[in-house]
Design a protein with these regions (language model features):
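Extracellular/periplasmic envelope-modification machinery, especially enzymes
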Residues: 1-257
Length: 257
């Protein structure tokens, strides 16, 4: 399909992308499982979108990869309802605590924390910017105590249109489907992420320039569909970013070699 299959972490039969009800993760080891260096990919479905790339990095560069992702589970240390309900998402809080406890028993070399837009409705309506930021810093701090390195991967923009549906409907007018930069990238967007990473003394990997020009955030770049819906990057596009992400990681002070 448009942009390749969804990451195998969704469908490998182990339940590695934990569903709403889950409070723990299965083992879910990838990459070079015998390697003496371990990286952890942590977050919700946005983190799972990056899985194909870090899976490839870990296989090529000799890392063991632990996939720790859970559906609709914001990384910020805040008490919020499950998306679409009024019920507190206790399974998310329990799962996050479980992951940190797991790593306290077996510390790792790198934790990759993937955040999502702070202005998703559920967070924007319930928490101030300061509360959101302190919740993110709290999560980052908890990983600093269990990992040699922590990197915060910045959120990718939320489009106004479902990319694949829009491309199918307007194949000859893709401009209609692109996100306009000023519409989909709030001005304080990266500054808040950078500040949070600085406060927690962790590394930061910006993503806006990977998916947007100064004018728009296109749904197609070259031969690759960028988004599979309004917010998740496609497998093919993520893999296409390999060299750029390698450079960005090095610039952030993380060398996977």
């Amino acid at each position: 399909g448009l942009g390749g299959a969804d990451p195998k972490v969704y469908s490998d039969g182990q339940g590695c992308h934990v569903d709403v009800a889950g409070r723990t993760s299965p083992l879910c080891e990838y990459g070079d499982t015998s390697a003496n260096r371990t990286m952890v990919l942590f977050g919700d479905s946005h983190a799972a979108s990056w899985f194909p790339l870090f899976d490839q990095f870990s296989r090529e560069k000799g890392w063991r990869l632990l996939s720790r992702t859970k559906s609709s589970c914001f990384v910020e240390d805040l008490r919020f309802p499950l998306y679409g309900t009024d019920l507190e998402y206790a399974e998310c809080f329990d799962w996050k605590n479980w992951v940190v406890n797991e790593l306290q028993e077996n510390p790792v070399d790198l934790v990759i924390v993937v955040t999502k837009r702070k202005d998703v409705e559920i967070l924007r309506d319930q928490f101030s910017v300061e509360e959101w930021q302190s919740g993110l810093v709290s999560t980052l701090n908890s990983f600093r105590s269990v990992s040699s390195d922590v990197v915060l991967v910045g959120a990718t923009p939320l489009l106004n249109n479902h990319a694949r549906e829009c491309i199918t409907s307007y194949p000859n007018n893709l401009d209609f489907c692109h996100g306009q930069f000023e519409d989909v990238v709030p001005s304080d967007y990266q500054a808040l992420e950078i500040q949070s990473a600085d406060d927690a003394q962790v590394k930061y990997l910006p993503t806006i320039d990977l998916v947007c020009t100064g004018v728009s955030c296109p749904v197609v770049v070259g031969n690759n569909v960028v988004y599979r819906d309004r917010q998740h990057l496609t497998k093919d596009f993520v893999l296409e970013l390999k060299n750029l992400i390698s450079i960005s990681l090095l610039n952030a002070g993380i060398n996977l070699d």
